[in-house]
């Protein structure tokens, strides 16, 4: 089946995805942005130095600032931040082809409702199947053609495999899944845990503490995913463990850098500057966990630190003096 692919969102991740799919050469790809001036520059210069400095964009990649440019696309990737996806669905929904599959590429939870992004998009776009792409992949690595593997999940395996085949390339490999819950929650919760890893680094309390956070954070993630109807095996895969290791250790991670700033005692506003998905997801995840009676002490601590309800020193003491239990 011949596919036509549209990527909405001309930030770093959307541009990188559009570029790597275009380089694969199997499907025509168009990158759709909201800023006509930026789109004109991308088309003329084949560079996006503001977010991907020095990386040339393929000549085969098309560009547009018009919403109707997605008409005719059989696969449409939503690559804007999580909290902007509902508005994007309303803006671009009228131009979707009848049989188009929508793929959310954000890693977050809808802040006002606590819904997963696939649930929100199905509510906004009820006539279209919705999938999710997530996992350990930085935009710069993808755009540079460095080997990257991620997960793509749909409601059925047939659709997931079709999407994986259409989007994968020589340096960008997707693994198909039918666990949309697990893939999405892994992507959202690892951002919160990456902030915790950053706090550890900024505070200077050692790599042993970071390793403990990753391991115990993964246990929290697994409890939450299973309680929400996802699969524990997904948590141990690319969208869970893989993404957590990447964002909890690499300074390319906005969430890690945000945590480092907190750990150093710097004032860091998650709503200013670089968008930090984990800062937005922490309170939502903590609230949902409490409603489900799930123990998530690391997530709770991160939420309380960001909200100013808990000092870092007190959070560390609370975590280290919890009742002894089995692993």
UniProtKB/Swiss-Prot annotation:
The gene is gpsA. GO terms for biological process: carbohydrate metabolic process; glycerol-3-phosphate biosynthetic process; glycerol-3-phosphate catabolic process; glycerophospholipid metabolic process; phospholipid biosynthetic process. It is found in: Cytoplasm. Pfam families: NAD_Gly3P_dh_C, NAD_Gly3P_dh_N. It catalyses: sn-glycerol 3-phosphate + NAD(+) = dihydroxyacetone phosphate + NADH + H(+); sn-glycerol 3-phosphate + NADP(+) = dihydroxyacetone phosphate + NADPH + H(+). Its main location: cytoplasm. It comes from Rhizobium etli (strain CIAT 652). This is Glycerol-3-phosphate dehydrogenase [NAD(P)+]. Its EC number is 1.1.1.94. Sn-glycerol 3-phosphate binds at residues 107, 135, 190, 243, 253-255. It is an enzyme of class 1 (oxidoreductase). Pathway: Membrane lipid metabolism; glycerophospholipid metabolism. The active site is at residue 190.
